[in-house]
């Protein structure tokens, strides 16, 4: 198992193909749905709750796919993509911890948007504080997170929940 504390884009793509933590580990999406370019830090003892943290980044440029369709003459990154990136990172954390199975977002307590990501921005930073992980019959991670654009916080989410399942056919 890879217990590195940072990951580059190639490693994140490898995770999407089941080649980073193993073929049975939770996977990140690939191509356009991978909303992360790098994980700057990941650990299991830091953060606001002392149970782990992740700091990750996405480079922004005007050529990103969503700016061309959301919206015409008013391009903005969809807020749901930033929220999905937070869920992606909780699932990645569970795989990094050694969980096996397929990751699925299970919910979120509260989400607030107080700004937007526009084509002229340079960088989105995700900061997650792990609140709890459960490794029993159910494997689940719970985290609070914020999204910053060029250093300014514009999204927050509490109680992001991701589960890891051995069988999702009846989910």
UniProtKB/Swiss-Prot annotation:
Catalytic activity: a (3R)-hydroxyacyl-[ACP] = a (2E)-enoyl-[ACP] + H2O; (3R)-hydroxydecanoyl-[ACP] = (2E)-decenoyl-[ACP] + H2O; (2E)-decenoyl-[ACP] = (3Z)-decenoyl-[ACP]
Superkingdom: Bacteria
A GO CC term attached to the entry: cytoplasm
This enzyme's EC code(s): 4.2.1.59, 5.3.3.14
Active site: 70
A Gene Ontology biological process term: unsaturated fatty acid biosynthetic process
Keyword Transmembrane included in the entry's annotation: no
Location(s) in or outside the cell: Cytoplasm
This protein's pathway: Lipid metabolism; fatty acid biosynthesis
Keyword terms, alphabetized: Cytoplasm, Fatty acid biosynthesis, Fatty acid metabolism, Isomerase, Lipid biosynthesis, Lipid metabolism, Lyase
Recorded GO MF terms: (3R)-hydroxyacyl-[acyl-carrier-protein] dehydratase activity; trans-2-decenoyl-acyl-carrier-protein isomerase activity
Presence of the UniProt keyword Cytoplasm in the record: yes
Pfam families named among the record's database cross-references: FabA
Description of how the protein assembles with itself and partners: Homodimer.
Similarity annotation: Belongs to the thioester dehydratase family. FabA subfamily.
Function: Necessary for the introduction of cis unsaturation into fatty acids. Catalyzes the dehydration of (3R)-3-hydroxydecanoyl-ACP to E-(2)-decenoyl-ACP and then its isomerization to Z-(3)-decenoyl-ACP. Can catalyze the dehydratase reaction for beta-hydroxyacyl-ACPs with saturated chain lengths up to 16:0, being most active on intermediate chain length.
Protein's name according to its UniProt entry: 3-hydroxydecanoyl-[acyl-carrier-protein] dehydratase
């Amino acid at each position: 198992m890879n217990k590195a504390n940072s990951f580059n884009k190639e490693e994140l793509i490898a995770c999407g193909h089941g080649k980073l933590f193993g073929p049975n580990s939770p996977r990140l999406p690939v191509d356009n749905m991978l909303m992360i370019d790098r994980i700057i830090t990941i650990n299991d003892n830091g953060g606001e709750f002392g149970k782990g943290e992740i700091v990750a980044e996405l480079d922004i440029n005007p050529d990103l796919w969503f700016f061309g369709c959301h919206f015409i003459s008013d391009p903005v990154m969809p807020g749901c993509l930033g929220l999905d990136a937070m869920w992606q990172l909780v699932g990645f954390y569970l795989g990094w911890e050694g969980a096996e199975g397929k990751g699925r977002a299970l919910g979120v307590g509260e989400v607030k948007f107080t700004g937007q990501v526009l084509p002229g921005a340079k960088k989105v930073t995700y900061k997650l504080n792990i609140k709890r992980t459960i490794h029993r019959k159910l494997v689940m991670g719970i985290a609070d997170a914020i999204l910053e654009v060029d250093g300014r916080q514009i999204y927050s989410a509490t109680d992001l929940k991701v589960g890891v399942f051995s069988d999702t056919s009846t989910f």
